[in-house]
């Protein structure tokens, strides 16, 4: 899962930086952007 988290982490930040915050953990866990 390390590879998935590493790949997903930058993707989420680039996808929607203003939406990422306290929910980042949830977003990474679900693998979806919950904006």
Swiss-Prot record:
Q: What does this protein do?
A: Probable toxin that belongs to the MSDIN-like toxin family responsible for a large number of food poisoning cases and deaths.
Q: Which domain of life is it from?
A: Eukaryota
Which keywords, in A-to-Z order, does the entry hold? Toxin
Positions of crosslink type Cyclopeptide (Phe-Pro): 11-18
List the propeptide residues: 1-10, 19-35
Which NCBIfam families does the protein's record reference?
A: amanitin
MF-aspect GO terms: toxin activity
Q: Know the name of this protein?
A: MSDIN-like toxin proprotein 6
Which InterPro entries does the UniProt entry name for this protein? Amanitin/phalloidin
Q: In which tissues is it expressed?
A: Expressed in basidiocarps.
For this chain, the family text in UniProt reads: Belongs to the MSDIN fungal toxin family.
Q: How is it modified after translation?
A: Processed by the macrocyclase-peptidase enzyme POPB to yield a toxic cyclic octapeptide. POPB first removes 10 residues from the N-terminus. Conformational trapping of the remaining peptide forces the enzyme to release this intermediate rather than proceed to macrocyclization. The enzyme rebinds the remaining peptide in a different conformation and catalyzes macrocyclization of the N-terminal 8 residues.
């Amino acid at each position: 899962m390390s590879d998935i988290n590493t790949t997903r982490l930058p993707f989420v930040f680039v996808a929607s930086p203003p939406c990422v915050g306290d929910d980042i953990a949830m977003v990474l866990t679900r693998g979806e952007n919950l904006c």
